């Protein structure tokens, strides 16, 4: 297992964006990180980014840390995972997670 750092982002104001709670296929056309606030930072162990994302989804829906002030993880939330290779951004989709590619982040 390896250790990951993670940062959870949630929409500042879901009514300001046209993609709150939308699937990634729809949201990626207008996705913009400026619509988000970082709401929690932590560390977690896992074998793969996929297993870590599933652990985080369970943790922040079933057994939230006392100092977590956001809502349960749901569609349109973003998790950034950091490991020794750098970071990757993931969008919580209706069924699983979608990688947010660099070209979308940089437009």
Regions found by a protein language model. Name each.
Residues 1-2, 105-107:
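Short intrinsically disordered terminal tails
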Residues 1-47:
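Extended boundary segments
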Residues 3, 7-11, 53, 90, ...:
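Broad hydrophobic/π-residue packing in well-ordered secondary structure
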Residues 15, 25, 39, 63-65, ...:
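Intrinsic disorder/low-complexity detector
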Residues 33-82:
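Short, conserved turn/kink motifs that form compact alpha/beta structural patches or helix kinks used as
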Residues 69-106:
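Short, compact, well-ordered microdomains
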């Amino acid at each position: 297992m390896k250790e990951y750092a993670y940062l959870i982002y949630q929409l500042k104001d879901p009514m300001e964006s046209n993609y709150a709670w939308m699937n990634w296929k729809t949201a990626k056309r207008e996705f913009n990180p400026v619509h988000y606030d970082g709401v929690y930072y932590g560390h977690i162990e896992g074998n793969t980014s996929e297993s870590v994302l599933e652990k985080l989804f369970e943790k922040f829906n079933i057994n939230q840390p006392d100092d977590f002030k956001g809502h349960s993880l749901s569609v349109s939330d973003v998790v950034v995972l950091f490991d020794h290779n750098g970071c990757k951004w993931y969008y919580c989709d209706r069924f699983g997670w979608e990688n947010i590619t660099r070209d979308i982040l940089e437009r």
